Amino acid sequence: MELLKAEKPVIVSMGAYAASGGYYISAPADAIVADRLTLTGSIGVFGMLLDAGDAMERKLGVTVDAVKSNRSADLSIFRGLTPTERAMMLKSVDRVYETFTNLVAEGRNLPVEEVLDIAGGRVWSGVDALEIGLIDSYGGLKSAIAVAVDKAGLGEEYFIEEVREAPQGLAAI
């Protein structure tokens, strides 16, 4: 987004929701426009790995033998995490969370401590998001376009080209 922002203003128009990853990609924008009822935020990170080993063995008789280069080389759904693997995953989740909160702090021009106060995976309505600085104004796509026109200094001379993604899979039928 930084490369795009060097060329032109980047404005985000949030729909019904733009949380977690949606907020991650929105935070660095020059402006964020959302509806009062938009659900956003969810500044948090988690990791999980299914442990189906016991069920696979009991119900289906499936067992797994593994050959590995080191103790943590076989993360698998066929067994639970060891304490070492759990610690490694937590460290990774913590690192991504720090990256996420720093990105929000920089993108929204907020102190990291303030972001940490509103983060923790909590979801906010558009009303709350405006109060705490996660969005800049209320509105829909038309409002976001008006913000973009203003920030780009386009005046009255501009046109809008709507680009729609081509349907894929069953939607293409």
Predicted feature descriptions by range:
Residues 155:
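Short polybasic linear motifs
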